[in-house]
């Protein structure tokens, strides 16, 4: 959609002598006070000429630019609010905070809840990876991490705050009066914005080639068929670039110098790259507006312009600018890494962790291309020291940040050992596509740039997309939200049936200890029953649905409830059989299986206790990745970058039992969503993000508070005690804890005791002597194993000395029959094929192990063997084959002869 001219023809512009002009280059309309201006002052229509503009403001650091902006709007009636983390954990569909408006999506922008203040001002650290491949090349125009300073106003039908006129006036006053930019240099470029299903006209504020701000007027909803319908809630959504404000006031040759100051020189030194010539940098930066990173020709033209301007050889210009761009990339990426990890990201192969790992590996790749020996964590440490006052969380979580980065580097170095074999596999393809490279990166974590050199050795060429990392990030930056209907275990016809039913009154929230109740039947469908009220808890938040009985008061017939589910606010009781005696309008009595429910309550509450204990022991980066509460045990999946030590598990367990012994009150609370977020932070969403204006919190006194819709005990003492019975790494970056509490702990102790008694009987000792007896048995086994190894070595030596090869065309073929296990065979085969032109085959019935010397390939032999039927394969010089039928030595030798 293109807005009409009237959308932008503001009284403010007319009264203040702004003229509407059409840019001579891009043909876009813009507003300016300079009647002679022909261009919109945005790149690539002009060069960066802000260096030549006389700006009255003193040079501002990022910190000073941020404060100047926030104070300006505070003085003009805006409430300053704290920024949110760079991980958008209040959103189920988005992993990273990409703009300040994300702070208020979806619940404020949809009108579900009011904003924390109106109007408000915030400076929100944001991360966008769509431009990650362009960082450094454009001298700071593109960054992965930046601060979006913003003032927002939310205009309701019955409450107008301000709109276009005031927003444009604020921008003009800030840039001309507060920063001292000459009025004739300020331009407002007409544009259109769309995002997150909303749209509206916007104005881009440009000065001297730099876009300093975007003023969005969110006033339309984009419908499913692509039409635009007016919104009742009209939102002023502005975004001012804090780093660009610092850059335009400092007039440094790159934005990186304005953002990082002396850290720029420190990074060049630590990385081991000579600092770029200052004159070359200034000229290159001035012409950088001409660069369109998506068009490699513009990069080439830019460098030719620099070469011509300075009279320097083009190759020297390219080499120096390439090196500097790589250092700028590392500056940018290490700050992004620091912020991600400080806010709790754990690098992994999925979700937000995937995006964190992508940035880390790209930084490591760049260091490798620069042939630098510096450890990445050393550079991140410099960033922490530099930003610790601006972002206190980076200092608080310093140990975790550095530990996680070093561990990622060690993993990356191990992965790079695979490069030769991956390159060999790719080299066999007739064409290497972008999809192939993404597949290799996703499966093995190998950047294509590092495959390039290995593939060149094999005379294989491929085209590396300039935006490779952006392509990969785009595939992983969002998550699909499941609807309430997708999450529930009910058939489609049942879901359709309940759409007309009223919400169920949740008695389990009024009294979590209520065991029975009376209710009225609102719906009966097959074996599904819906009542006006219930104390049966429906499955949710990892807690299983209640079971029990529904009793027909007319006939006294009892129906077993085998599960309870919920769709939106309607609770469905699933019965073992169809309730033939129950009709809509009948009164029934419900009784829950209290013993089962009470076990679930204990396991649910102790899950909260253990999660907080894990954070205390392991660090604030720990986040709930999943949970399940059953009557038999509880299960909690947490994000963490390492396997837990025995000592860490013991500490978590000790803290949890201490909280139980302290008899702490457990209390549910209901709060306004925004109020809860501002008071407790987004960690309240550990167990999921509820979609309501008021949210239910569970507070364990002086220990933990988070959003939770489950049922809980009212005091930690009711849990009794807890024992962690299993800890395992279930996927990269996720650790699973399993535990038992209360009666389930007693059951576990009994079962364990029974196993000890049984084991003692098997080995003929008493339970108290079990450990010492097992040690003796293990020592005896070890002695026998050592003896077996000695015998095997004797047999192996004898075999190698006496085995005679078959000769085929100057090739030696060894055949071994019925020898030892597979690993032992493999070792003998390796020794036999240590010299060129040698093949060794071990035969055990119809199973074959085949090895060749390094100058031969095993695949041709395998191919010939499998012609007679069978399965198997291998790569390089080793293979395993299972034939459909057993073959004699002579038959195998004949097959080998054919393959040669």
From Swiss-Prot:
E.C. no: 6.1.1.7
Transmembrane segments: none
Catalysis: reaction(s): tRNA(Ala) + L-alanine + ATP = L-alanyl-tRNA(Ala) + AMP + diphosphate
Binding site for Zn(2+): 604, 608, 708, 712
GO cellular component labels: cytoplasm
Cofactor stoichiometry and binding remark: Binds 1 zinc ion per subunit.
GO BP term (any one): alanyl-tRNA aminoacylation
Keywords tagged on the record: Aminoacyl-tRNA synthetase, ATP-binding, Cytoplasm, Ligase, Metal-binding, Nucleotide-binding, Protein biosynthesis, RNA-binding, tRNA-binding, Zinc
Cross-referenced PROSITE patterns: AA_TRNA_LIGASE_II_ALA
Enzyme class: ligase
Molecular function terms, GO-annotated: alanine-tRNA ligase activity; aminoacyl-tRNA deacylase activity; ATP binding; tRNA binding; zinc ion binding
InterPro entries: aa-tRNA-synth_II/BPL/LPL (IPR045864), Ala-tRNA-lgiase_IIc (IPR002318), Ala-tRNA-ligase_IIc_anticod-bd (IPR018162), Ala-tRNA-synth_IIc_core (IPR018165), Ala-tRNA-synth_IIc_N (IPR018164), Ala-tRNA_lgiase_arc (IPR022429), Ala-tRNA_ligase (IPR050058), Thr/Ala-tRNA-synth_IIc_edit (IPR018163)
Domain of life: Archaea
Function according to Swiss-Prot or TrEMBL: Catalyzes the attachment of alanine to tRNA(Ala) in a two-step reaction: alanine is first activated by ATP to form Ala-AMP and then transferred to the acceptor end of tRNA(Ala). Also edits incorrectly charged Ser-tRNA(Ala) and Gly-tRNA(Ala) via its editing domain.
Family: Belongs to the class-II aminoacyl-tRNA synthetase family.
Domain note: Consists of three domains; the N-terminal catalytic domain, the editing domain and the C-terminal C-Ala domain. The editing domain removes incorrectly charged amino acids, while the C-Ala domain, along with tRNA(Ala), serves as a bridge to cooperatively bring together the editing and aminoacylation centers thus stimulating deacylation of misacylated tRNAs.
Protein name, UniProt field: Alanine--tRNA ligase
Species per Swiss-Prot/TrEMBL record: Saccharolobus islandicus (strain Y.G.57.14 / Yellowstone #1) (Sulfolobus islandicus)
Name of the gene encoding the protein in the UniProt record: alaS
């Amino acid at each position: 959609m293109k807005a009409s001219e009237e959308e932008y023809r503001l009284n403010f512009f007319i009264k203040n002598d702004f003229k509407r002009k059409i840019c001579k280059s891009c043909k876009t309309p813009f507003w300016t006070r300079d009647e002679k201006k022909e261009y919109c002052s945005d790149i690539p229509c002009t060069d960066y000429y802000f260096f030549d503009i006389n700006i009255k403001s003193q040079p501002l650091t990022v910190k000073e630019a941020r404060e100047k902006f926030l104070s300006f709007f505070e003085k003009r009636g805006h409430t300053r609010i704290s920024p949110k983390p760079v991980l958008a954990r209040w959103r189920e569909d988005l992993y990273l905070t990409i703009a300040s408006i994300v702070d208020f999506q979806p619940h404020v922008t949809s009108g579900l809840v009011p904003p924390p203040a109106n109007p408000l001002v915030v400076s929100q650290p944001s991360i966008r990876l769509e431009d990650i491949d362009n960082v450094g090349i454009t001298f700071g125009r593109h960054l992965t991490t930046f601060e979006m300073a913003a003032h927002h106003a939310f205009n309701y039908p019955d409450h107008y705050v301000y709109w276009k006129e005031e927003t444009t006036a604020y921008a003009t006053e800030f840039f001309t009066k507060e920063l001292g930019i000459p009025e004739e240099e300020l331009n407002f470029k007409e544009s259109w914005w769309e995002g997150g299903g909303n749209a509206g006209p916007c104005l881009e504020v440009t000065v001297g080639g730099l876009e300093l701000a975007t003023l969005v007027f969110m006033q339309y909803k984009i419908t499913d068929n692509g039409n635009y319908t007016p919104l009742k809630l009209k939102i002023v959504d502005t975004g001012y670039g804090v780093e660009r404000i610092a850059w335009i006031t400092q007039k440094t040759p790159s934005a990186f110098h304005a953002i990082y100051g002396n850290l720029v020189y420190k990074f060049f030194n630590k990385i081991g790259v000579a600092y770029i010539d200052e004159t070359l940098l200034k000229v290159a930066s001035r012409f950088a507006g001409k660069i369109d990173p998506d068009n490699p020709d513009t990069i080439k033209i830019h460098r030719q312009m620099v070469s011509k301007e300075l009279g320097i050889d083009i190759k020297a210009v390219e080499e120096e600018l390439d090196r500097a761009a790589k250092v700028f990339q590392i500056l940018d990426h290490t700050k992004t890494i620091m912020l991600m990890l400080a806010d709790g990201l754990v690098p992994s192969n999925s979700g937000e962790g995937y995006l964190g790992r992508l940035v880390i590996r790209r930084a490591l790749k760049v260091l490798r291309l620069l042939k630098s020996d510096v450890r990445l964590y050393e550079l991140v440490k410099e960033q922490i020291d530099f930003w610790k006052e601006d972002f206190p969380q980076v200092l608080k979580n310093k140990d975790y940040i550095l530990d996680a980065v070093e561990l990622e580097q060690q993993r990356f170095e191990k992965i790079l050992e695979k490069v030769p074999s991956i390159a060999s596999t790719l080299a066999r393809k007739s064409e290497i596509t972008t999809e192939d490279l993404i597949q290799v990166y996703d499966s093995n974590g190998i950047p294509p740039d590092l495959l390039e050199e290995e593939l060149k050795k094999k005379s294989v060429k491929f085209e590396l997309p300039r935006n490779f990392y952006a392509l990969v990030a785009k595939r992983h930056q969002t998550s699909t939200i499941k609807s309430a209907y997708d999450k529930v275990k009910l058939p489609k016809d049942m879901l359709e049936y309940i759409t007309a039913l009223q919400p169920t009154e949740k008695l389990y929230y009024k009294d979590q200890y209520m065991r029975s109740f009376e209710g009225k039947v609102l719906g009966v469908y097959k074996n599904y029953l819906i009542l006006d009220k219930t104390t049966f808890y429906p499955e949710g938040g990892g807690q299983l649905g209640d079971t029990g009985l529904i009793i027909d008061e007319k006939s006294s017939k009892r129906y077993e409830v085998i599960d309870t589910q919920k769709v939106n606010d309607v609770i469905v009781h699933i019965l073992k059989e169809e309730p033939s005696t129950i009709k809509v309008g009948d009164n029934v009595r419900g009784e829950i299986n209290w013993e089962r429910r009470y076990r679930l309550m204990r396991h649910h509450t102790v899950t909260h206790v253990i999660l907080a204990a894990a954070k205390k022991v392991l660090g604030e980066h720990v986040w709930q990745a999943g949970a399940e509460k059953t009557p038999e045990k509880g299960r909690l999946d947490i994000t963490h970058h390492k396997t837990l030590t025995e000592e860490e598990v013991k500490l978590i367990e000790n803290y949890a039992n201490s909280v139980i012994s302290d008899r702490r009150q457990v209390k549910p609370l209901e709060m306004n969503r925004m109020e809860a977020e501002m008071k407790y932070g987004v960690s309240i969403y550990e167990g999921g993000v509820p979609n309501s204006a008021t949210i239910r919190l569970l507070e364990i006194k002086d220990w933990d508070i988070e959003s939770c819709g489950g049922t809980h005990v009212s005091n930690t003492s009711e849990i009794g005690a807890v024992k962690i019975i299993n800890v395992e790494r279930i996927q990269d970056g996720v650790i699973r804890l399993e535990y038992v509490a209360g009666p389930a702990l007693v059951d576990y102790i009994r079962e364990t005791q029974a196993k000890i008694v049984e084991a003692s009987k098997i080995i003929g000792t008493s339970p108290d002597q079990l450990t010492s007896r097992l040690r003796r048995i293990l020592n005896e086994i070890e002695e026998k194993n050592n003896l077996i190894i000695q015998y095997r070595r004797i047999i192996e030596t004898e075999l190698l000395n006496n085995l005679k090869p078959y000769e085929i065309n100057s090739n030696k073929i060894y055949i071994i029959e019925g020898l030892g296990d597979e690993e032992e065979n493999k070792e003998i085969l390796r020794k036999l094929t240590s010299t060129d032109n040698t093949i060794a085959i071990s035969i055990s019935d119809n199973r074959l192990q085949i090895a060749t010397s390094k100058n031969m390939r095993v695949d041709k032999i395998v191919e010939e063997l499998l012609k007679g039927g069978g399965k198997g394969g291998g790569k390089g010089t080793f293979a395993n084959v299972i034939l459909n039928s057993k073959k004699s030595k002579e038959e195998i030798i004949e097959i080998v002869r054919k393959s040669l």
